[in-house]
UniProtKB/Swiss-Prot annotation:
Protein name as catalogued: Class A basic helix-loop-helix protein 15
Keyword ATP-binding included in the entry's annotation: no
GO cellular component: chromatin; nucleus
Main location: nucleus
Domain-related comment: Lacks a classic transcription activation domain and instead possesses an N-terminal region capable of inhibiting heterologous activators.
Alphabetical keyword list: DNA-binding, Nucleus, Phosphoprotein, Repressor, Transcription, Transcription regulation
Length: 189
C-alpha cells in the first residue's frame, strides 16, 4: 500500500500568558487567561466559530470573481494547445507535400522527416549539378570563368566547404551520393 509522505504540521508558537499593561484587548484589559489553546491548535470548527460573522474564507481576487484567474489560465492553455496543434498540422502537411515531390521508389513506406529532408537536400544538389553540367557543355568557346550560375555554385561550395571542413571536387559527387541513397531506400535499409 502506498502512503503519502506529508510533512509534520506546523504549530503556532506558544503564547506567553503573562501580559504587560497595555497589551491584550484594545481597551487595555487583560485577555481571558482561560484554557483556550493556541490558534494553530484549535480544531477546524472552533476556528470557524472564532471567526467574525462577516468574515469568510480568503479568496484571491480574480478578473471575473472567484476562480476567474484559474478560468483565464485554462483558457490561455487551451488556446496555446490549439495554436501548437495547428502549427504541427501545417508542418506535417508541408512534409507530406515534400514527400510527394521527391522521387523515391518505396511508395508503400512513408519516409521519416529526416529521410525526407536528407533526400530533398541531395536531390536539389544533384539537380544543380546536372544543370551546371548541361549549361557548361552547351556554351562552347567560353573564355571567361564560366556562366554566372556555375560561378555562384562554386562560391557556395567554397563557403560551405570552408564552414564544414570538406569540399567535393566535382558536382558529380552529389549525383552519385543521391543515386546511392535512392538505391538504399529502394532496398529498404
Amino acid at each position: 500500500m502506498k502512503t503519502k509522505n506529508r510533512p509534520p504540521r506546523r504549530r503556532a508558537p506558544v503564547q506567553d500568558t503573562e501580559a504587560t499593561p497595555g497589551e491584550g484587548t484594545p481597551d487595555g484589559s487583560l485577555p481571558n487567561p482561560g484554557p483556550e489553546p493556541a490558534k494553530g491548535l484549535r480544531s477546524r470548527p472552533a476556528r470557524a466559530a472564532a471567526r467574525a460573522p462577516g468574515e469568510g474564507r480568503r479568496r484571491r481576487p480574480g478578473p471575473s470573481g472567484p476562480g476567474g484567474r484559474r478560468d483565464s489560465s485554462i483558457q490561455r492553455r487551451l488556446e496555446s494547445n490549439e495554436r501548437e496543434r495547428q502549427r504541427m498540422h501545417k508542418l506535417n502537411n508541408a512534409f507530406q507535400a515534400l514527400r510527394e515531390v521527391i522521387p523515391h521508389v518505396r511508395a508503400d513506406k512513408k519516409l521519416s522527416k529526416i529521410e525526407t529532408l536528407t533526400l530533398a537536400k541531395n536531390y536539389i544538389k544533384s539537380l544543380t549539378a546536372t544543370i551546371l553540367t548541361m549549361s557548361s557543355s552547351r556554351l562552347p568557346g567560353l573564355e571567361g570563368p564560366g556562366p554566372k550560375l556555375y560561378q555562384h555554385y562554386q562560391q557556395q561550395q567554397q563557403v560551405a566547404g570552408g564552414a564544414l571542413g570538406a569540399t567535393e571536387a566535382q558536382p558529380q559527387g552529389h549525383l552519385q551520393r543521391y543515386s546511392t541513397q535512392i538505391h538504399s531506400f529502394r532496398e529498404g535499409t
